[in-house]
Amino acid sequence: MEFSFSVEQTESLSDYQLSGNLMDKESANDLVNSFEEKLNDGIIYFVFNLEKLSYINSTGLNVLIGLLTKVRNSGGELIICNVPKKINQLLLITKLNTVFNVAMSTNEAKNIIKKETNSNVSDN
């Protein structure tokens, strides 16, 4: 299944829905470009909903780690949520569950950001 994503933007948060298989940098180019564009526009809080992500390999994980590093270097945060069981097992095996901020749901991810920023991140 080909990788794709959609994004919903609020004033202070970019909410990404990832779908398909994230296996190579080429398929993630649009994601990286979109992310960097948001970051350059001053958006520093991101939620990546992985609910529809079918598969990710080490290259795909590397893409996510690169995005996480960029946002943290900018003083922000990237939270992943709705992680499928197989992908969660991969995060546990690689110990990336200690690197990424992982939430059970999109609402939980937004609440984490609200606590960090003391702001009114929209639930829409």
Where would I find each of the regions flagged by the language model?
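Residues that form or immediately flank small-molecule/cofactor binding pockets and catalytic motifs
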Residues: 12, 85, 107
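Long, contiguous secondary-structure blocks with strong helical propensity
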Residues: 12-13, 77-78, 114-118
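A charged, well-structured terminal subsegment
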Residues: 102-124
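Amphipathic alpha-helical interaction surfaces in cytosolic regulatory modules
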Residues: 22-100
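General small-molecule cofactor/ligand-binding pocket signal
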Residues: 6, 81, 103
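STAS-typified acidic loop motif
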Residues: 3-33
